Design a protein with these regions (language model features):
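N-terminal secretory signal peptides that target proteins for export/translocation
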Residues: 1-3, 40
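Sec-dependent N-terminal signal peptides of Gram-positive bacterial secreted proteins and lipoproteins
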Residues: 3-26
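N-terminal accessory/pre-domain segments preceding catalytic cores
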Residues: 28-62, 70, 79, 83-273, ...
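Sec-exported extracytoplasmic/periplasmic mature domains
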Residues: 220, 268, 284-292, 325, ...
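Solvent-exposed loop/turn segments at secondary-structure junctions
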Residues: 247-250, 288-293, 311-313, 337-341, ...
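Secondary-structure boundary elements
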Residues: 251-305
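Hydrophobic/aromatic-rich core segments of domains that either
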Residues: 315-385
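Alpha-helical segments with a strong preference for the paired helices of cellulosomal dockerin domains
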Residues: 499-524
Length: 524
């Protein structure tokens, strides 16, 4: 504040000496311009910025229905007995009031994972109807026959599949892995029919949910099918598994090569180096390619996001997962709740696990991509950081997830731009970032209310920042944000001196007066 007063006092002194010179009007952000005016009443800036009222903490999620969570800890294992891990799946109840008098023991249900709600799409069939529920259209069978590619497609990725590795550590791992591997075999062979489970592999409804969810979350490249399972409504035991094909299957001869080609084009530009460098490139390349849109809401797979450049959270997460795994980086597709149902990733970077949310690093501004994207506020964060605004779902929605505690690969730690508005030297740091990055400074703000704190600090210190940058002429400034990441932008003419005080010192002296007089008389 003392610098601001000296600067204003200095200008007044010069203006009294040079009364005929034009007065410089300093433009400010229209959100709260009055508090930031340095010399005269500010003009209102028309550059679009994310105000506190209009900015969004990342993308809107995909469904208004909260995803339920259960009471098990993230490391809890599925019990061997039929105790439900799903709080919405009640104890076995037989409704004897059915008007059609159908015995529930004869009712079979097919449950398929829904990528939008993260719940199960459940269809009920009588025993006779279930026999006729196979996908047997000639068109589909022809498509499947012409698209058989064997295991080579899925062998392109050689890193460990996270979901399978977690199933392998559970008490009933032998049964779970046999069913998981059978699903993979069905995907490799484009199996259409239901596949019955041997008697010694019968599992409960929730166990089947867990295994199919683990498989689904392990294979982002399987964009033409979702796993499903059949269970008896009365016993709640799973007896059969099946793949539920979508419309991509009919065009797979064209779409599969295009999917691979698009991924390989992106991967071709990836730098050689550490996992962090590869991940950062892939994260940013994906965000620059994709537009968040509900037009592909029903698709929710990696193809539409990667190839067509359109998607919502599931598409972002599947596409990033696939690119990371192609780059040799272990990754997993995680579902949960973040204001609405949401999906993001786990990634193992240079030996440590982190969370990364590409969707929320690509926020929407006024219905369009934010001009300062890609952001990195959710790039390699810890579990504690994630839980500020994300809640991962428990079993059976996810397998047990990592407790991420490492911070070495957190973007803002790597770039030394984690700040508090109470930090000393912050004016000089921000001025330096703005000058080195074309008038844009990305910061991770640790204050309890990062947006409010950063905005107030910026408006209070803008004159000092401009002076440190040796600005010539008027300027505009504002901010944008996603989560704790605050983007400060500054539009103006920077003088050629090294960022700092006008004459390189912190004191007010004759050199300051001479420089200011030169600017007011010559504009340079």
């Amino acid at each position: 504040m003392r610098k601001m007063k000296r600067w204003a006092a200095l200008l007044c002194a010069v203006l009294m000496a040079v009364t005929l010179l034009p007065t410089q009007v300093w433009a400010t952000d229209g959100t709260d311009g009055g508090s930031a005016a340095a010399l005269e009443e500010p003009i209102v800036n028309d550059k679009p910025t994310m105000s506190e009222e209009t900015a969004t903490d990342g993308q809107p999620a995909d469904d208004q229905t909260p995803a339920p969570t259960d009471d098990e800890t993230p490391d809890a294992e599925v019990p061997e007995e039929s105790e439900s891990a799903d709080p919405q799946e009640p104890e076995q109840e037989v409704d004897n009031q059915d008007t059609d008098n159908t015995d529930d023991s004869d009712v079979l249900c097919r449950a398929t994972l829904d990528p939008i709600s993260h719940e199960l799409e459940v269809e009920q069939f009588s025993a006779e109807e279930a026999a006729d529920a196979e996908i047997t259209s000639a068109e589909l069978n022809n498509a499947l026959t012409s698209n058989k590619s064997g295991s080579s497609y899925f062998d392109i990725i050689s890193v460990t599949r996270y979901g399978r590795a977690k199933l392998a550590k559970m008490s009933r791992s032998t049964v779970y892995l046999k069913i998981y591997d059978r699903l993979l075999e069905m995907a490799e062979n484009f199996t259409v029919d239901k596949v019955s489970l041997p008697t010694n592999q019968k599992i409960t409804h929730d166990e089947a949910w867990l295994v199919t969810a683990a498989f689904y979350s392990d294979y982002p490249e399987l964009f033409w099918a979702r796993p499903s399972f059949w269970y008896n409504k009365n016993t709640m035991l799973c007896s059969e598994i099946q793949l539920n094909y979508n419309s991509h299957i009919y065009n797979l001869n064209t779409e599969l090569p295009l999917f691979l080609e698009t991924a390989e084009t992106i991967l071709a530009g990836m730098p050689t180096g550490s996992d962090y460098e590869k991940e950062l490139y892939l994260h940013d390349a994906l965000i620059k390619k994709v537009t968040y849109t509900y037009s592909k809401l029903e698709e929710q797979n990696g193809y539409t996001t990667l190839v067509e450049g359109k998607g919502v959270c599931a598409g972002y997460a599947f596409a990033l997962q696939y690119l990371l795994m192609r780059a040799g980086i272990q990754s997993y597709y995680v579902v949960g709740y973040a204001g609405e149902n949401h999906a993001w990733n786990l990634a193992k970077i240079d030996g440590e696990w982190y969370y990364v949310d590409a969707t929320w690093d690509d926020p929407v501004y006024n219905g369009s991509d934010d001009p300062y994207s890609p952001y990195h506020s959710y790039f390699n964060i810890t579990t504690a950081m994630l839980q500020e605004d994300h809640t991962p779902s428990d079993i059976p929605y996810n397998v047990p997830l990592e407790n991420c505690t490492a911070t070495d690969a957190f973007y803002y730690k790597v770039n030394d731009t984690i700040v508090s508005t109470t930090d000393s030297g912050l004016v000089e740091k921000v001025a330096d970032l703005l000058q080195r990055n074309g008038g844009i400074a990305h910061l991770y703000v640790t204050d309890s209310n990062p947006v409010m704190a950063a905005r107030e600090w910026y408006y209070e210190n803008i004159v000092s920042i401009a002076r440190a940058m040796q600005v010539g002429g008027g300027y505009e400034y504002g901010y944008s944000y996603s989560g704790r990441e605050i983007v400060l932008w500054f539009a103006g003419e920077f003088l050629s001196k090294t960022p700092g005080e006008l004459n390189g010192s912190s004191g007010l002296d004759i050199l300051d007066v001479e420089l200011l007089y030169q600017y007011l008389t010559t504009g340079s």
